[in-house]
């Protein structure tokens, strides 16, 4: 069995990752595969918190939101993340993984509100905690929510699951000579103008000395390898 390099981690999942090959919504086989990977990591004894996006259902900055009040559109996006969190919780339940959802928006009949001491207790008890509704405020992305919650719970690293297997010197889909960085500092990312997270989220991680690992969620076993400290994806360090 693989060993863990981190005791407590924050996993950022995009809503789009749940679509799989579909154009919208939640692809069942994709969410089942993701929960297999999450369950495998939880079995290592890693304290795992997850922030999930809502882009597979609605995004405040998407073309469909054009003409809408930005705050209203962002609140709709937050509610989309709650739907995704419930779907992920249900799928994890079927794997026997004890999971709690905490929302930054109060919907008491559906999910419990975000309360930091409770979240910490759940993690210490070995439960997976899913943070929904972003930060609870418009104009902030779920990347920023991941950085914020990661800092609040004392995570040792933010694991950003994407469609590419790390940070490259250029777009690998356009430039065949693009190379993947195994490790890169926060300062180097800024100098090279590489895209990792939105500026607010990136600055928060940098200020809190919270490393980020970017890896592909579509690569089998990548999450476990990232948690085990293997050469998977790209590590952004201080």
Curated annotation (Swiss-Prot):
It is found in: Cytoplasm. It comes from the Bacteria. Keywords: ATP-binding, Cytoplasm, Kinase, Nucleotide-binding, Pyrimidine biosynthesis, Transferase. It is an enzyme of class 2 (transferase). Its EC number is 2.7.4.22. Pathway: Pyrimidine metabolism; CTP biosynthesis via de novo pathway; UDP from UMP (UMPK route): step 1/1. Gene3D superfamilies: Acetylglutamate kinase-like. One of its GO terms (cellular component) is cytosol. Catalyzes the reversible phosphorylation of UMP to UDP. This is Uridylate kinase. It comes from Bordetella pertussis (strain Tohama I / ATCC BAA-589 / NCTC 13251). The lineage of its organism: Bacteria, Pseudomonadati, Pseudomonadota, Betaproteobacteria, Burkholderiales. The gene is pyrH.
């Amino acid at each position: 069995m693989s060993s863990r390099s981190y005791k407590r981690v924050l996993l950022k999942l995009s809503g789009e990752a749940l679509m799989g090959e579909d154009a919208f919504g939640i692809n069942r086989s994709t969410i089942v595969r993701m929960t297999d990977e999450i369950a495998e990591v939880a079995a290592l004894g890693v304290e795992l918190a997850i922030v999930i996006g809502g882009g597979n259902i609605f995004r405040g900055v998407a073309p469909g939101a054009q003409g809408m009040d930005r705050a209203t559109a962002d609140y709709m996006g937050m509610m989309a993340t709650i739907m995704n969190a419930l779907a992920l919780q249900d799928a994890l339940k079927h794997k026997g993984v004890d999971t709690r959802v905490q929302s930054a928006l109060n919907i008491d009949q559906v999910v419990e509100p975000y309360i930091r001491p409770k979240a910490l207790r759940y993690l210490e008890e070995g439960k997976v905690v899913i943070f929904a509704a972003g930060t609870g405020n418009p104009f902030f992305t779920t990347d920023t929510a991941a950085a914020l919650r990661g800092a609040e719970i004392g995570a040792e690293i933010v694991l950003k699951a994407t469609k590419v297997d790390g940070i490259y010197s250029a777009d690998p889909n356009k430039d065949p000579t693009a190379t993947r960085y195994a490790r890169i500092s926060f300062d180097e990312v800024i100098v090279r103008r590489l895209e990792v997270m939105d500026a607010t989220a990136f600055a928060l991680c940098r200020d809190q000395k919270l490393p980020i690992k970017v890896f592909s969620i579509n690569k089998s076993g990548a999450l476990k390898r990232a948690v085990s400290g293997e050469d998977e994806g790209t590590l952004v360090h201080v």
